[in-house]
A protein has these predicted regions:
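An anion-engaging/catalytic patch
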Residues: 1-123
């Protein structure tokens, strides 16, 4: 896990969880709850169209649609500010349970045994 200072949203930290098999999952903490970049989760699970996966599987109350000056932003590897769709823990599980791929089970194990405990420990 790495921690990045979010320059657009002062005081907001982006936690990046790395896994050799699945890739990276970027997370922000809002009101003491983790919110995950939906695209990261969908890609880790093997969805070929992350927008469709989020639209089809994640309820509206479990996601925040990215909007400039309204929602948290993240900075990508090229230094560009982005306003992604964030999903909460319920949305995370919705994507996991919606996946028919075998690696969804391993991804769920990684998230529940490493990612979520680390978030709860470091906040």
């Amino acid at each position: 896990m790495t921690e990045e200072k979010n320059m657009v949203n002062e005081g907001l930290n982006t936690l990046v969880f790395n896994n050799d098999e699945f890739g990276n999952v970027r997370t922000v903490i809002l009101n003491n709850n983790p919110w995950f970049v939906g695209k990261d989760v969908a890609e880790c699970l093997g969805y070929t169209n992350s927008k469709k996966a989020i639209r089809d599987h994640v309820d509206d109350e479990d996601k925040i649609m990215g909007e400039r000056n309204v929602t948290p932003s993240i900075t990508d590897k090229l230094g560009r500010v982005q306003y992604p769709v964030f999903i909460n823990e319920s949305g995370l599980y919705a994507l996991i349970f919606g996946s028919k791929l075998d690696k969804a089970k391993e991804f769920k194990h990684w998230v529940t045994s490493e990612v979520l405990p680390q978030i709860r420990k470091t906040g």
